[in-house]
Amino acid sequence: TFNEPVVIPEQGYLYQHHYPLVRDGKRAIQVAYHIQLASSMAVREFRKMNSPGQIGIVTNLTPAYCQDPDNTEDQNASQAVDLIFNRSFLDPSVKGEYPRELVSLLKDNSVLPSYHSEDLDLIRDNTVDFVGVNYYHPRRVRHRQAPFVSNVFMPDKYFEYYVPENCRMNISRGWEIYEKGIYDIGINLRDNYGNIPWMVTENGMGVQDEEQFMDKDGMVQDDYRITFIKDHLKWLHRAIQEGGACFGYHMWSPFDSWSWSNAYKNRYGLIRIDIAKEAKPTYKKSAQWFRQLSDQNGFTDKDGAPCK
């Protein structure tokens, strides 16, 4: 029904990165609610068609990890982040209802969306068959060290980000590389969402100036991308072995793709696009490796352990 629905209110109505470039938490909540309502309506219309197939929603899940698991304030910070950025779409889409904790949080801030009682019936009766998961990075949060000052509701009043020591970073994006997050997502869906079928619809890394990794024959030797994929697949494989219902894995992206925010600055593809020369697309090393991965339905790690 939607791809990354939370991005619209988050980036357009909270953090001013996307159109309409406003900072209004109440509008953000109303927009998010209407997106969920539209998604549920799409599910309803699909059911009316009695067509073969299934229908789902694609969510960009970012597991929230608190700095100190033994600190109640840090725990509350990560819970607030999870409620606002993950469960706000995951729960109504899969369970047909909003988390009571989220409703209380919004009510406490006087930002509950306007709604009709029949809307809630619509959401309850039209849940999805599967979930698509876009996973790139976690959120590392703690309770605020100083009060957050704003004349409108902003989720940031409940938390602040921090960077863990010795974490792996994709410096091109400023995103932490934390492959275990994909496992945690799978276990969460297994334990808290009825083990709903799901697939990884996006996973990958955008890297700037990949020309520096090009060999004399013009192939990008992107071993860093191969390592990224392997590490995530190993954790995904573990989630499946432990009963997770993941049925597929897609990369973002097959080709270097154009971004709304930075054009071709960060390259995500397994296949290189040379926009300067308008040349024929060329395989990167990762493309050859991924083809072998697909043909063999797995790979053998350096330690000889199979991942299939």
Q: What do the predicted segments below correspond to?
A:
Residues 1-308:
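Active-site region of glycoside hydrolase catalytic domains
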